[in-house]
């Protein structure tokens, strides 16, 4: 970024004559203080909290599923759509016994250079396999789940992707506990 392109909140405030954090105020063309100001309604805010489900058995007897927003998938699977302006409303199943060399991250919304070297940085599949093998975990579900966290219609995401993953985790995978891994 060149010196001429750097704009601070204070600089923008001096130029605009108002607080640039006010809704609808751009710092400069294409730069908004928050994503919700650029795309109103893009953030889910809830008045109620979701109660945690108590663990009903010891972890060394529990079957774990991993759910990640990093966009990982097997190289042989169709990648998630990273070009659609509203995001992808799908997800990928990743076999829990997959090898890192079989996996890739197809994602443009965050840097994943380190995860390209070691997938466990964003999707700790080998660490979970090790914990299951040593008996710290009772086991792993046959599949883990991954989706793209970038999504501009969170209510649709909640109704579709989140609902479909939750149903698969409970009905098909029969998970006792879920590890949520944000990217």
Model-inferred region functions:
Residues 2-183:
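Metallocofactor- and cofactor-centric catalytic cores in central/energy metabolism, strongly enriched
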């Amino acid at each position: 970024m060149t010196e001429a392109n750097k704009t601070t909140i204070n600089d923008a405030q001096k130029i605009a004559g108002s607080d640039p954090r006010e809704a609808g105020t751009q710092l400069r063309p294409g730069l908004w203080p928050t994503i919700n100001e650029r795309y109103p309604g893009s953030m889910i805010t809830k008045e109620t909290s979701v109660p945690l489900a108590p663990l009903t058995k010891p972890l060394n007897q529990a079957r774990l599923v991993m759910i990640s927003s990093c966009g990982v998938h097997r190289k042989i699977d169709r990648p998630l759509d990273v070009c659609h302006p509203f995001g992808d409303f799908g997800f990928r199943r990743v076999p829990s016994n997959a090898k890192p060399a079989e996996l890739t991250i197809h994602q443009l919304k965050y840097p994943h250079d380190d995860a390209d070297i070691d997938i466990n940085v964003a999707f700790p599949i080998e660490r979970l396999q090790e914990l299951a093998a040593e008996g710290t975990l009772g086991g792993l579900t046959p599949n883990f789940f991954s989706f793209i966290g970038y999504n501009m219609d969170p209510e649709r995401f909640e109704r579709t992707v989140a609902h479909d993953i939750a149903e698969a985790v409970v009905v098909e995978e029969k998970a006792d506990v879920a590890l949520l891994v944000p990217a």
